[in-house]
Amino acid sequence: MKTSVLRWVRYRAGQRGAGAEREGKGRSVRARGWVLASFAVLTAGLLVFHRAVPNSVGRTGSLLESFLPWLGLVVVALLVLAALRRSVTALVALVLPAVGWTCLFGGLLLPEAEAGPYDMVVVQHNVSDANRDPVGTARVLAAADADLIALQELVPPATAVYEEALAPRYPYRTVQGTVGLWSKHPLAGVRPVDIKPRGITEDWSRGLRAVVRTPHGDIAAYVAHLPSVRVRAAGLMSSWRDESAGLLGEAVAAEEQTRVILMGDLNSTLDDRGLAPLTSRMNVAKRGFAFSFPASFPVARIDQIMARSATVGRIRALSRTGSDHLPVVARITLR
């Protein structure tokens, strides 16, 4: 009798222990689900309200915006973890960042509209002052058969190589400082554009403006190379770039020609608020990511093509050259 009672007591104790263990595991799974859901909501907040992230400390907002599309990978990682945890809470919460990312960047994946009768093709490329293969670089650029080619970091003797290699297809050209423009159409009104920040004291010429005489009317073309940014322990160092972008924006705003095309290494992505003086005044590509830097493993597009009174079609990267940037090409539909 005593033996039976002891067995019954042990059995009940085992049942209570197993129940407590199952309850503990359930709580742990639910807790992990809420943690994943919290990260999902945070990611959605960064995507939708990235402009609210302050720039006062280390330009944190600009740093986030430079890599904003890559938050899509965070969404994918959270989705995998939520599926492994079988957390309905996390999966539901992930709808928020998924919708946010799609609204911001989903359109870039859509196909390009058909070419119109008043289109131009333009190429933008920072050829790098350390480029050891200017001949091969010129070959890649010429193969795009663009109407305009904008180049930055032009230094002798490489500049002469580009001039000679591109001359057969591009008889019109201008080089101002370290930036240049090659064109199939005549150029007029060529002049440098002063976009030098006040803190730079040495000789520094990185902007030009020219009027392109196309069969469809005159177009003001701007070529620019904004100062580089650096990521330090204190954050993103971009004050010179931001100042230069402001000067370039003022020049574009004062341009008398109705139609304007801007091509340049702007050392900034389009989402970065540092380019607001330009993106607020000009149209940008709505199709294509075209990450252009670094060429070995592109993670951001800092080479930009913009237009006023014209539409920028799909932007795409060309084959790698001897530069640390990839060339980008886009079709411009004139209005």
Question: What do these predicted regions represent?
Answer:
Residues 2-163:
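N-terminal, active-site-proximal structural segment of metallo-dependent hydrolase catalytic domains
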Residues 118, 131-142, 153-335:
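Soluble catalytic domains of enzymes that build or remodel membrane lipids, polysaccharides, and related
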